[in-house]
Amino acid sequence: MPIPGTPSRAELAEHLVRTRIAGDVATPRENNLSHYRKLANGDRGFWLGLELGDRWSDEQDVLAVMAERVGVNDDPEHRYGQDTIDPELTISALERMAGRLRKAADGGQRVLFATGHPGGLLDVHRATAAALRDAGCEIVVIPEGLTTEEGYVQQFADVSVLEHGASLWHTHSGEPMKAILTGLEREGRPLPDLVVADHGWAGYAAQHGVDSVGYADCNDPALFLAESEGTLQVAVPLDDHVVSPRYYDPMTAYLLTEAGLK
């Protein structure tokens, strides 16, 4: 569903709903609530590299933040069926992210890109990295030989990913980002000025003091909680794996145009 050039805000909102990146998304309400409950109950697999302590032990508090920042249904009695992402919140978050990208470009900053959802978001990150490089940023090259229990931490098209069994791997873990930051310190190299990522890659970096922005789905509340607390600079709500990765192209074009990078 291509949109020639860069869409207007209204055109992008329509596109996000039509492709189910936002609007009535594929993730069912019961899955969202299950994840909110598991985070509140201290399941660290849902903390996405962050340290939440006991601050979010009430799942109703988690739901309230998700309603405010993502646009899910705020009714705690709505337990099953359709849930939503507000496209206007997605676009507003993209505009906030664009501001941070502009700052990176103006300062010629060192930027690290990473994704735990390569099937959906790899090219979003690749295109953003290319635009920042053209604007004078240094795109951080990760150390070689990094591993986690899940696989190898590699870099393709300027984007760090996890490789497992000769395949790019879906992961929400913060461990790959831990491996990168630890590896940089071990080599005596400075940490990035900015991390642009998603899921645990963004969460771990933000938790450890690196300016970070990222993408997350409506069933991954941790990044939105971190944004609400000021740990993460921007969390963009979206369905992170729709039918075609090309559906994200208009969103990427809008982001880069807003940042003055296109």
Swiss-Prot record:
Transmembrane segments: none annotated. The keyword Transmembrane does not apply. The keyword Hydrolase applies. Disruption phenotype: Disruption of this gene does not cause histidine auxotrophy. It is an enzyme of class 3 (hydrolase). GO terms for molecular function: phosphatase activity. It comes from the Bacteria. Keywords: Hydrolase. Its EC number is 3.1.3.-. Displays phosphatase activity against p-nitrophenyl phosphate (pNPP) in vitro; however, the physiological substrate is unknown. This is Phosphatase SCO2771. It comes from Streptomyces coelicolor (strain ATCC BAA-471 / A3(2) / M145).
